[in-house]
């Protein structure tokens, strides 16, 4: 059943992927809002999938499928937090394709049930995995902000207005997003 919810989330993230490609050529507030609502709905489906997976008895949190799913969910969560703070959807151009790809790979097939030895401190293992993937998600967002910063800086130095990337915010905003993501990502990695 968690795979069904994950596939619903994948369909919603597909709208975000289309937005990412559409935003490269022109900006549209209507399409941006539709993509944000679809991504929010996808996050709800994704969260339900992760909760059902967590409540099942045979879950292996360190598996590739679950790791990709968790990283995609946290990356989208960080994107939504950045959107709530800065009111810019430009990092979505990088984040949406990454989240879609990770969710797509995780939703391809049911994960095989692995027989593992009983872990005595299961709570510590889950906390460790969640903290590591939180750090990874923050670094994914920092990577996206860094790419956007380089593109915007090159555009401003060329002094040619380009309609292709006119949706990017000011360099200071992109720099703050990247810096704060790094500031959050590295401590969670350690």
Model region roles, listed by residue range:
Residues 1-57, 61-190:
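Polytopic transmembrane helical bundles with strong interfacial aromatic enrichment
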């Amino acid at each position: 059943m968690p795979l069904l919810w994950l596939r619903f989330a994948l369909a919603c993230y597909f709208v975000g992927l289309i937005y990412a490609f559409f935003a490269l050529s022109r900006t549209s507030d209507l399409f941006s809002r539709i993509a944000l609502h679809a991504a929010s709905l996808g996050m709800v489906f994704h969260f339900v999938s992760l909760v059902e997976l967590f409540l099942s008895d045979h879950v292996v949190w360190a598996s590739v499928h679950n790791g990709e799913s968790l990283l995609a969910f946290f990356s989208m969560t960080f994107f939504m937090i950045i959107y709530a703070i800065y009111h810019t959807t430009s990092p979505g151009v990088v984040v949406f394709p990454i989240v879609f790809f990770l969710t797509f790979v995780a939703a391809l097939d049911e994960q095989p049930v692995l027989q593992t030895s009983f872990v005595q401190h299961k709570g510590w293992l889950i906390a460790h995995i969640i903290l590591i993937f939180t750090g990874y998600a923050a670094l994914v967002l920092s990577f996206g902000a860094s790419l956007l910063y380089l593109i915007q800086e090159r555009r401003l130095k060329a002094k040619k207005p380009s309609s292709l990337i006119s949706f990017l915010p000011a360099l200071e905003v992109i720099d703050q997003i990247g810096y704060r993501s790094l500031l959050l990502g590295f401590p969670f990695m350690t």
